[in-house]
Structure formats: structure tokens, C-alpha cells
Amino acid sequence: MKDLMTSYSFTEKKRIRKDFGKHRSILKVPFLLAIQVDSYRAFLQGDVESSQRKDIGLHAALKSVFPIVSYSGNAALEYVGYKLGEPMFDERECRQRGMSYGAPLRVTVRLVIYDRESSTKAVKYIKEQEVYLGEIPLMTENGTFIVNGTERVIVSQLHRSPGVFFDHDRGKTHSSGKLLYSARIIPCRGSWLDFEFDPKDALFTRIDRRRKLPVSILLRALGYSNEEILGEFFEINTFHINPDKGVQLELVPERLRGEILSFNLTDGGGVIVEAGKRITARHVKQLEASGISALAVPDEYLIGRILSHDVIDATTGELLASANSEVNEDRIVAFRKAGIDSVGTLWVNDLDRGAYLSNTLRIDPTRTQLEAQVEIYRMMRPGEPPTKEAAQNLFHNLFFTFDRYDLSMVGRMKFNRRVGRKEVAGEPVLYDKKYFSDRNDEESRRLVSKLGETSDILDVIKGLCEIRNGRGVVDDIDHLGNRRVRSVGEMAENVFRVGLVRVERAVKERLSMAESEGLTPQELINAKPVAAAIKEFFGSSQLSQFMDQNNPLSEVTHKRRLSALGPGGLTRERAGFEVRDVHLSHYGCLCTIETPEGPNIGLINSLAVFARTNQYGFLETPYRKVVEGRVTDEVEYLSAIEENQYVIAQANTLTDDNGQLTESFVPCRFQGESLLKPPSYVHYMDVSPMQTVSVAAALVPFLEHDDANRALMGANMQRQAVPTLRAQKPLVGTGIERTVARDSGVTVNARRGGVIDQVDAGRIVVKVNESEIIGATDAGVDIYGLIKYTRSNQNTCINQRPLVNVGDIVTSGDVLADGPSTDIGELALGQNMLIAFMPWNGYNFEDSILLSERVVEEDRYTTIHIEELTCIARDTKLGSEEISADIPNVSEQALNRLDESGVVYIGAEVRAGDILVGKVTPKGESQLTPEEKLLRAIFGEKASDVKDSSLRVPPGMDGTVIDVQVFTRDGIEKDKRAHQIEEYEIKRVKKDFDDQFRILEGAIYARLRSQIVGKVVNSGVDIKKGEVITGAYLDGLKKSDWFALRMKDEVAVEAIDRAQKQIQAYQKEFDQRFSDKRSKITQGDDLAPGVLKMVKVFLAVKRCIQPGDKMAGRHGNKGVVSNVVPVEDMPFMEDGTPVDIVLNPLGVPSRMNIGQILEVHLGWAAKGLGHRIQRMLEANAAIADLRKFLNEIYNHDKSVVGERVDLSQFSDDELLNMAKNLTDGVPMASPVFDGASEQEIKRMLDLAELPTGGQTQLYDGHTGEPFDRKTTVGYMHYLKLNHLVDDKMHARSTGPYSLVTQQPLGGKAQFGGQRFGEMEVWALEAYGAAYTLQEMLTVKSDDVQGRNQMYKNIVDGDHQMVAGMPESFNVLVKEIRSLAINIELEDN
């Protein structure tokens, strides 16, 4: 979408998509890999000065573990800073050598030893040193990690946010169906604390899901007495006891509501409530109005109430009644006798003031703080004898020290918000005013002065009681406000911290030695645990996944994936329907369409196009601010929690030119409900119609016309498209193709603007604009190396090809080279095919696809796959294996593709079974027969000591060898082939560096020339003083003599000196880089233990489309190719054009993916417009006419914002160039939920001079007769998926057998047989094919003697079968014997 103001870049001028979007794009699609790249950048903070680093990532992990203090406290190891070194090998070398791409981490630590003798902490000595802490993996520019030579992605995890959550059991625990409420405090690390009600309304607590204890034990362990507990949780009613009889209640009218009194309630004048009637809210109001402050009640009214305090006889000090005991008649008598004038009771009722804590205190066996702490100790450590210190320390370490407990910034924010506090910041530990004010250490005093009167645990229990009392609501755990994203950086930080904690334990032990023995920090710290933790995480964590590299889209989608699985997450089996379902809060944050089918459905999600994570890790999505019914261009990001309070309108709401909402009622969302509101009520508006979907779903045109299930399949299947030989842009796209291709990193984009200086298949050189050159050392030349024929993770081919010519002027960001599945910088996953919807002789039954032979002929769906085959020579017990061309018992012909080192040469075309690398393995000495001994003695034959174990081409594969790599262990002599490869590689690198240097040197001389030509000379070679320098003079001069020139002009002299310094600096840098590369190439390789030599052979396999391959459109319309039909038999149009693909029309109505029909219509129009442009070009039409026609296509409808294309910016040549690119079809963009309407499609068909109905008359290819009725014909972007028949087809005659059952193995990978199962056996039984059945069950399966005999018989030419005993019967007999039942077979 372009406004008239913006100018078009070099790439955009080549081809412009006609956009049908009605809405102006307010916000550019953000960088799609930001969630990965930003997260890891923040973790490393590699480009930030040590002193400026924020408290996150590596820095935070190191700070949290250090300083490490020895047990005696006399030695400490402090953290100063860290720095990342340079990676040893670059990305390409790591991929090639199977290494991990990372940089060494060096941490500066300071060892401080204190003087033992001194009373104050006097420092004895300090030692500061850099310590190596292992390799930290580095992320590539494209958001991946290279681990052991393969690209991996760390998928972000969606997990339950730390904080406090209130929930209930949905009535499932107790038979009565009563809702049992619970609360849970979840920290980032540390023990979980649960509170839960039982069916009798007592409140219990659990720590780490262990056995439950009454909650009062926890409160008592914090230091609260019974009275304090009751005071915290209940309001108190005060009764004044009259000396003779009767009681006065201090009246709070509200507290009487709902009670039934046994006496008349009067206000001095009249009766307000009669005895036996319930007091209602109306009565309460009357009482408040009457202003009565005290109420005389009979003694019976006090009986059964619960005392809030201990009642003590003031004279004797005797305890008359303890807090939480009930008042009875005897106690009232005792109170009067002791002269107690007032008592407090708890205000409780069954309606909304439950006596929960009072009930709980009655079942609490403990009386003192220590008893309670001991009880908790017993529960946490059953079987260990508790001591006072142990119990106190364990309790303190559970929730109150940062070493063991961390709520984290997020957890504290969520906690404070949920318990209703204003401030969101706070301490990472749980705080309790009573507990910390009773302790008397420095940390406790700091916390008390900072946090004062708050108490976390009390607040949670109060909140839970409020919910149980009917005030307050439970949390929705599936709401995105309660689930947060853990990205790479955070996970890496946690793993790093775990490694450091392991190191800490070891260092503490050694620190006590350091005091006496004077060890250095390097000797104290062993980096292995850190390195091991990191290696394990990146190598084998559930969230570290082998990157899906089928095509650029699959890469981008994989990096934007959010998984609820993984460590600390859910498991497939336990996840219920609610977690997987689409939630209201997903809007704009998670894609509502794209998720896998199968067991992971809903657990793995994709990030929506505009979504991002905020500082706390919650997903947020952008909205445009609406002020008084007018939409502004101000964009604000709101998280799921924040957007709950606003009314938000949809992106396609109608507005006038000033942004005023024009509808009287606007469709909006508010608190998860869809409603209609007047414009003045609207707070925000969506930024884009495609806000709710992910990148893959946003690539499906007319998505709004597809059923959601099919849209899901369409989005998922685009990720499986194999890059075709020549990518072809989709005629009908959505306008986001360019963004995806750019952000995926498969294309080469200009870093800076300039002029193309050189181009070849492997390199592009750009001479940078003067204005963009930075610094004196910058030569102003950018060199881009292209990737050629490289294997991807999925064995598809990655290849880049240049798009520019010498002399082209490019700006920053322009596409210089296309990668796989991209066409002029746009994502192009498939091919645009001419499609007809009609049945054809049953060949498109059940979603089958009928293809024309022309498709195969033109290589439209031909793909290249690169297979890597490896041969390893190991050191065995019997001797070492050897790679050589000297292999026993192999014909000359089988070896004719190998060189003298036994390795296949590059360019060889090989078939299944051909030897690629000759290898022999020593075999054990076998007993020789006398004849063999004699032959040995005569001929000295020793070759039979080795057996052939060569690398052969696997069955079902053929191709061309495109590359061979030989890796040799250090200290083992390299063979001739290894030397050849090494020499070639060094030559290539040398040429590369020489070229780069020559280009840079040329650029420097060219710039210098422009600065000194025309200047007057003072001195120089072959020139007199006072002469003027000319271009001809410089051409005749040796380049090195330029630097001897001296002028009057100081600036020119400076330019000469600067150029000389630049060239010398580059020379030095290139020499250094070349020697580094050379030493890397010549040094031995780091191979696995026991491996002497490894040879990798790369085969390029060309796969044409054939019956059995799976294909699909973008709307979930998938099928399998059933037949490839000669062109002459295909249905053809009036002008003789045969169709490419025939699809079954019955695949559309029941599937409800109508989007494909609209795509076909619009695609036909796009192609037709291309034909019209081609006809104009062939007729040499005037440029003005061409301009007018293009204007007619692009700028017809002024109301459509996305359509305006400013053709006046194009020169005639540029216009002609673009027109040539459009002859194949004018690409269209129909954005998701904002696409082309039926009228617009008809208009386009009309403009293309095609029938507006979208149907045309087809003729039968066999007979040439017209079909009975017109057919829907048009162009659809169709994909070939990575489910190829060649990879699945498999057959075996003989092969490996299972050890136990002696039946053939199963599966292609094991070269197994076809399973002849139960139903197949029944089929043969039904046919009465007894001999065939016997053969199947014996000699073809597991009758060992029978199959050996069969082989002998066939060799002897005797085709008889003798079936014996199947091995599986013997297995059955053994199993029965294991049950102590003996079975013996009797000879019959």
C-alpha cells in the first residue's frame, strides 16, 4: 500500500502489486523475528559497556549468584563484569564442520581475603582475574542457533505467569458438588504455597503440594497469636455485661442484617422488627436513621457467640475463657462474678461472614510459634528429628530469602495487582509485617522500613475468604493476562543461573582452602557445570528444535511459534479442552487459525502479525487511539489485562476523510463481548484487519471466505511447500509477501545505497554513496557473498541468484538477490497454474489431482533436493578401518567412479547401490580349511582379512555428486583427495580475498583520483613543480607512485595520506584474515572419539512431479496427483490453450473454502491483463497509451486507499521495464479481511476482456467436442508439498530381521518389509489360498530353516517350498513357560 507521497524503491519499480485494500496502513508490519532477536540481544548485552549494563540476562544471573562467601566468612569471590570474545569459526565454517557457533565468555572476578585476626573486617589481599566460563552460543542474524552444525530454533514458551491465582474445583472434589475455593502463590523459583477450603469450611495450606496443614499453623509460624489472627480476619462486636442481668450491644446496624431476633427490636418509640422476623436492608436503614448506638439484648443473645480475646479475671489473673471459645451460660455467670464489664465477639453469619479461620483454629494442635515451625519442618522433612535452629531456618528459607525464593518482577506486579495494591514494584520474597518486625537482622530491618504494614500471606487469605463469602471472583487461568511468554533470552538466563549455582557449591568448598593456600580465582572456578547446562539446553531441551527449513515461511513461522509444552509447562496428556481452545484474550496476540492438527492442537500457537511482548513478558497488540469519535494516527500497545477496560472498534469501521467515525452504531468489543456502541463511547480501534492472524494465515488471499478448519490446513500446508526450480510470484497475494521474504533473511538486501559495481553468480559488489560512508577507514564498498546450492535442514536446496545488473542504482533495503522460494523479493511458494473445476474420467475422484504433461515438461514443479551421505572410518579393536579404492571382491566397473583415494569424484551421476566411498573393515581371524591354507602358502593371499563396508547410494535414490568433504583427525596423514580439496579451498579463499582487496583498492584509488585531478603539484614522480595533475598523467603512473605526489592544497595531501593508510590497513587486515583461514583449513579436524576420518558426499537429486506426490492450494484444498496426461488429451479453451490442472468441483461445497474460487477468478483476470499488456508491447504501442492502461488497472477506484499508484514517478524506460515484468500477469493483493469484492473482480475480468462470469467453454481433448456446459477456469497459486512419493515408496526382497521374533523389520528407514496383518490373513483365508497363506506365515516371515532351505532350493533350480516351525511359535512357547506351564511338542 503506497500513498502518492512516497517514492518507489528500485525493487518496487520492477513490479507493483495492485492492492484492493480499503484501509490505509497506519503501522508497518514489525520485524517478524523481533521476539527471538531482541530477547537474545537483551540476554547477551554484548554491545553494551560493562558499567552501562541493565539488570537482565547474563549480567543479572551473575549478579544473583555472586558474591560467593566462604563458610567462615573470611573469603569472598565478587563479580566485576564480563565480556564476550570473538567466535572461533564463522557461521559457514560451523555448519560445514559440524560445530556450534558461539563465543567464549570471560568473566572478571575479584577474590577478597579478609584478615582473620582483625576484629573489624579488614581486607588482607585482593586478586582480580579473568575466568573463562565456557562458550555462549551466538544467535545468527536470522534468529537461529547453530548447534553441532545444524540450525536450531529455541521456541518461546507460553506458561502460567508467577503471582497469585484464585480458583475453585468446579464442584468435582466433594460428592455434594459444593465449590471448594483455593488460592495459589506461584513464584518464579521456589516453593509453591497453596490455600484451600475443605468441605467443612476449614482453611488449609499446602507447601509444594505436600500434605495439608491447617492454615493457622502457617500464621502461627509467622508469629501470630490466636487473638491476633482473629483480629486480622474478623470484625468485633462489643457486648457490655450488666451486673445483674441483660447485656448491652454496641450497635452497628449493618451487622444485624439477615438475623432473626427472639425479641422485638424497638427504636424507643415503635417496634422496627417484631420478634421472629428476619432483619432486612430496609430495617437496617431505619435503624441507621434512628441513631441508636446501643441495644439492650437478653443473655441468650450472647450464648453461642465466639470470643475474640482471652477473658481474664483482673484480680486473680485466672483465664476465664480463651479467644475463639464459645460463650455459654456458665461463662456469663463467671464473667459477672469476676466483674468483667465488656467482652468482644466475632461478627460471623452463614450468609456472607463465614467463621472459617475460627473453625480452622479449633483443629490446630499447635500453641506456640516454635511448635508451628516444627510442625512445618515435620511435613517438609518427614523422618528427620527437628531442632529449633533447623525448624526456624527451614521455615525462613521457604519463602523469605532471595536465594531460595523469587517471585520475580512479573510475579510481584501480578501479586500486588491481584490483592488490590496500588504500587506494582516490590520485593521478590514474600513479606509479612509481624514476622520481619520480630526478627532483628539487618535485612529484616530494611524490609520493615521499606514495606511497613503490608503482609502478603494475610492479604491472600483475606482475598480467598472474601471470594468464599461471595465477594470477588476467581481467575480465568486461560486468559492471556495470566499466561506470559518466556523467550530465548529468559530461558537461557535461567539455565545459566542453574549452572552457576552448581559452580557456587564447588567454589564455597574451595574458598576455605583459598584462605590458607592462596589460590587464584581461575583455580577456584570450574566452568564445566555452566558449559554443560548451556550445552544441554541448546542441544536437547524440548524447546530447542531442529529448524523447519522447507521454505522461508516455515522458518519465520517456526521462530514465531509459542508452545505451552516444555519444562515448566503443560503435557499433551494432561492438557484439557479449555487450555487448547481459542480465548477472547487471544485477539490480536495469538493467531486464532494457525495451530497444528493432532495431539498438539491449541498447545502450540503462532504469534499474531502485530503482536509483541512487553517488559513483563505478556503479549500486547497495537490499537489506534480514538478521541471523541475521531480516529487518530497515535498507536498504543495494550496487553490483554489493559484492553479489558476499553471499548475497541474493528479495523474496517467506516470513517470519513478526517477520521471521524461515520456509523451511528459502531461494532465493538468490550470485556470480551461484541456490541454496538455510539462513536463517542469508543476508546480505541484496531490498526489493521489482519491483526488477529499470524503470518502464514495472512498469506492466504480471501481468507474471510474460507471455513476456519480449511484455513488452518491452508496456513499449515504453506509451510510444507518445497521451493521449486524457478520461483513464481503468486498472481493473487495479500500484500505481505515482500515483508515475509525480507524478514526471513533468505534474500540479500542492500545494507547501504549505491551503484552496482560488479555482479556474478556468487558475489555482488556495491559502490556505496559518498553520503553513506562512515569514518576514515571505510572504503565505501559493500561486498555480498551469495549462498550457492546448499542443503537445508529438510534436504531442500538453498540457492541465491542476483537480480541486479552492473550500473543499477540501489538504495538501502533493496533486494539484490533472490533466495529459495522468492521472486523479485516476494515470497513465492508455488506456481500459478491454469485450473479447471470439472470431473475428468474419474481421475480426480476424492481430491485427486489431474496434471498436464506440459507441467512436467516445463519443469514447473521440479525441485532439487540435496542429500548428505556420510562415511566414517573408525578405529576398531581388530585394527583401523581404511578408506581406499582397493576393495575385495568388487568389480572394476563398480569402482570406476572413485579416485585413487577411494572417494567418488564431483559430477559423477550415481544410482542406488553405487559405491560413493570405498571402505574396508578388518574382520576377525577365521579358521581356515586346509585347502585355503595351501592357497595362502602358495600365493601369499591376505586380502580376505578385510570385509567391504563401503558407503553406497541408498535404495531408491539417484543423483549427481555436487560436493565432497574429507575430514581427517589431527595427527593422521591426509590422503591425496583431502590435499586436493584443501588446495582448492585455499585457492578459492585467496582469490576471494584478492578480489575483495582489488575492489576496495580500486574504489580508494577512484575516489582519490577525483580528489587530486586538477590540483597543482609541488613534487612527484615524472612531473614538474607547478604542473597540474591530469587523468592521463595518473593513468601512466604506477599506483604506488601516487602517494609520492605533494600539492599546495593541504586537503589533497591529506586525501593522499588517508588513502595510503586505508590501503595499508586493508592489506594488513586481509593478510591476517587469509592466514587465519588458511590455518583453519590446513589444521586437523576435531572429530568424535575413535573416528579417524570422515567423508561427506552431497548428492543433488532432481525430482519431477509424478503420480503420488501431494499438492495443495492455499485454502486447505489438498490432494494427491493421480495421473499425468498428455497435453493433447487435456480439456482446452476456445483459443486452444490447454488447462494445466483439473480439480474436482465436489471438493469445494462441503469443505466451504470458497476463497479458492475467488482466487481462481481474480487470477484469471490478472493473467488476462498481462496478456493485454503483452499485446500492446508487441504492437509497439505508445508509452502514453501504456501509461494510460496501467493507470486504468491501478488507479481506477479513488475510494480504495491501497490502490493509488503514482505512475508519474516512473520514467519511460522504467515504465517499459515494469510493463515487461507484468506480461506474465499483473500481480494483485487481496489483504485478509479487507479483500477484493465481487464487483472489483468482475471489473478486473472486464478490463482483461474475459467473461465476467468467470466461466468459459472448454473442449474435450480426446474428441475436440465442447463440453455440455461452461466450466470455471482460472489461475490458482498451487504448491507442491514435501510429501513426495519418492521418499515414501519402498520395496524389499530380503533384508534385516528382528532378533527375537525373526520377522522382517518394519519401515523404510530399517529397510523393512510390508506388514501382512490380521485382515490380510483373513482375505487369503476367504479366497481359500492355502499355499499362499502358508508361504506368507512361514518362509516369507519367520521360519528360519524354511527360508534358508528356500534359498538353497532356488539356487539349485528346484522351486519347492518346505515350511517349518515359525520362530514366533517358539517365542510363544517360551512366554508360556515363563508362566510355569510347560509345553512340549510331540512328534506325530
Swiss-Prot record:
Q: Which HAMAP family match?
A: RNApol_bact_RpoB (MF_01321)
Question: Which top EC class is named for this enzyme in its record?
Answer: transferase
Identify the InterPro entries for this entry. Answer: DNA-dir_RNA_pol_bsu_external_1, DNA-dir_RNA_pol_su2, DNA-dir_RNAP_su2_dom, DNA-dir_RNAP_su2_hyb_sf, RNA_pol_bsu_bac, RNA_pol_bsu_CS, RNA_pol_bsu_protrusion, RNA_pol_Rpb2_2
This protein's name: DNA-directed RNA polymerase subunit beta
Please state the Enzyme Commission number of this protein: 2.7.7.6
Q: Which UniProt keywords apply?
A: DNA-directed RNA polymerase, Nucleotidyltransferase, Transcription, Transferase
User: Is this entry keyworded Lyase?
Assistant: no
Q: Which reaction does it catalyse?
A: RNA(n) + a ribonucleoside 5'-triphosphate = RNA(n+1) + diphosphate
What Gene Ontology cellular-component terms does the record carry?
DNA-directed RNA polymerase complex
- Record text on subunit structure and interactions: The RNAP catalytic core consists of 2 alpha, 1 beta, 1 beta' and 1 omega subunit. When a sigma factor is associated with the core the holoenzyme is formed, which can initiate transcription.
Lineage, please? Bacteria, Pseudomonadati, Pseudomonadota, Gammaproteobacteria, Lysobacterales
Give the family from UniProt.
Answer: Belongs to the RNA polymerase beta chain family.
Identify the coding gene.
Answer: rpoB
Q: What PROSITE patterns does the entry give?
A: RNA_POL_BETA
Instruction: Extract one GO molecular function annotation from the record.
Output: DNA-directed RNA polymerase activity
Query: Per the UniProt entry, what species is this protein from, by scientific name?
Result: Xylella fastidiosa (strain 9a5c)
Nucleotidyltransferase: is it a keyword of this entry? Answer: yes
What's one GO BP annotation on this UniProt entry?
Answer: DNA-templated transcription
- Functional description taken from the UniProt entry: DNA-dependent RNA polymerase catalyzes the transcription of DNA into RNA using the four ribonucleoside triphosphates as substrates.
Q: Name one Pfam family in it.
A: RNA_pol_Rpb2_3
